[in-house]
Swiss-Prot record:
Belongs to the universal ribosomal protein uL29 family. GO terms for cellular component: cytosolic large ribosomal subunit. This is Large ribosomal subunit protein uL29. One of its GO terms (biological process) is translation. One of its GO terms (molecular function) is structural constituent of ribosome. It comes from the Bacteria. Keywords: Ribonucleoprotein, Ribosomal protein. The gene is rpmC. Transmembrane segments: none annotated. InterPro entries: Ribosomal_protein_uL29, Ribosomal_uL29, Ribosomal_uL29_sf. SUPFAM superfamilies: Ribosomal protein L29 (L29p) (SSF46561).
């Protein structure tokens, strides 16, 4: 995953893509925590970046649930 995904970029994704990103971020966070526990983690900052990315994804999902923002709609040419 890219370091520090912006909220504007995440808002352009569909619900399925957000769920996929969330799953990937959680898996990466788990791996980073294992590395930290075993003393193999090189970049401690990456833990915070991933945690914030997860929080951004949850926030966008909640905004859509409450109707504060809408999921992007597909525009068909024609």
């Amino acid at each position: 995953m890219a370091a520090g995904v912006k909220a504007a970029e995440l808002r352009e994704l569909s619900e399925e893509e957000l769920v996929t990103k969330l799953r990937e971020a959680k898996a990466e966070l788990f791996n980073l925590r294992v590395q930290a526990a075993t003393g193999q983690l090189d970049n401690n900052r990456r833990l915070q970046v991933i945690r914030r990315e997860i929080a951004r994804i949850y926030t966008i999902m909640r905004e859509r649930e409450l109707g504060l923002s809408a999921a992007p709609t597909e525009v068909t040419a024609g």
